[in-house]
Amino acid sequence: METLDYRFDGTTHAHFPTNAVLVGVLASGNLEILLEPAALDGAMTVRIITAAQGFGSVWQAVITDFARRHPLRDVRISINDAGATPAVVSLRLDQAVETLLGGGTP
């Protein structure tokens, strides 16, 4: 298992209608993403736990792209990965934000 941690400055306030938002299913070739409110001085943190070791540069590119498109403030993102492709990761991250903005229902 490999753990990767990232931190980005956020500009967009996220209103959580529930305590957290969870999307995806941790299964072969997929991942689950949890968004939680957190006092992070306006930052967004991302922690990835993955079984696929050695893909740090790919993860960094995908997460940096997401942070540019969705610069959330005071949000902790936890990703549990079971070998998802970059396209699936981006899709699930966008789904998580859409769920958050849509009131918490996937």
From Swiss-Prot:
Record key words, sorted: Cytoplasm, Phosphoprotein
Main location: cytoplasm
Residue numbers bearing the O-(phosphoribosyl dephospho-coenzyme A)serine modification: 28
Location of this chain's protein in the cell: Cytoplasm
Domain of life from the UniProt record: Bacteria
Record's GO cellular component terms: cytoplasm
GO function terms (MF aspect): acyl carrier activity
Record Pfam families: ACP
Family listed: Belongs to the MdcC family.
Function: Subunit of malonate decarboxylase, it is an acyl carrier protein to which acetyl and malonyl thioester residues are bound via a 2'-(5''-phosphoribosyl)-3'-dephospho-CoA prosthetic group and turn over during the catalytic mechanism.
Protein name: Malonate decarboxylase acyl carrier protein
Organism: Stenotrophomonas maltophilia (strain R551-3)
Taxonomic path: Bacteria, Pseudomonadati, Pseudomonadota, Gammaproteobacteria, Lysobacterales
Gene that encodes it: mdcC
